[in-house]
Amino acid sequence: MDSYIDIKVRVWRQAGPKAQGHFETYDLKHVFQGASFLEMIDILNEQLVAEHKDPITYDHDCREGICGMCSMYVNGHPHGPDSAITTCQLHMRKFKDGETITVEPWRSRAFPVIKDLMVDRGAYDKIMQAGGFVSVNTGGVPDANAIPIPKPVADEAMDAASCIGCGACATACKNGSAMLFVAAKVSQLALLPQGKIEAAARAKAMVAKMDELGFGNCTNTGACAAECPKSVSLANIARLNREFLAAKFKD
């Protein structure tokens, strides 16, 4: 049964992109363990406002593990110490009474801090704009049911499509690589007939944009898949490598 705990929250505070950041520690008492992590931040912000202090700025939207906006490091882990969840799905029952919880923004050169825990993840949007779509005419909605796709292939495409673009893979990687994100977005389309027509151009364009934006190289450490809140498989990176190599041979 959930109870109430007293905690210390050690939060990264940074006034702006060019400002010098620092940690500040706050005491928070009588926190219900059934509360979500973001609800705890909300309670802390109410306390800060009541004390006439600047509330903590952080990104959030759906609070259902879908949008990927609640991007923050919690005790050294992207999205927190629990596995296969986003920060908004993390609950305070994961923490103990008297514990100090350290909260930081994404650690990646490609995701600059805007303020406090909020970062600019626009780099992922630019990669998607480079080729993460189907632009050819694939017919109307009923036509999709006329194209037979084996269930194992459809399942693989669906697993790749579960990527929510949160950025945990790039920030968990010691090289700051976005390969798992790019691989998931390439795979979900390359596996399906509608996406095969532009597969070569897509792989080259998205990898080129990833490199242009300053993401690091993949060295197969597997940290990205270990921290991914949607458990996207490393097999997608292998598929991206095959797609990219095949595309280069077509040049």
Where are these regions (language model features)?
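Long, hydrophobic/aromatic-enriched structural stretches that serve as scaffold segments
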Residues: 53-54, 69-73
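Glycine-rich phosphate/adenylate-binding loop and adjacent beta-alpha elements
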Residues: 74-98, 103
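Eukaryote-biased recognition of intrinsically disordered, low-complexity regulatory segments
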Residues: 3-27
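Short, structured protein-protein interaction patches enriched in aromatics and acidic/basic residues
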Residues: 57-69
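Ferredoxin-type iron-sulfur electron-transfer modules in oxidoreductases and energy-metabolism complexes
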Residues: 35-54, 101-251
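Short, contiguous acidic and Ser/Thr-rich linear segments
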Residues: 24-36
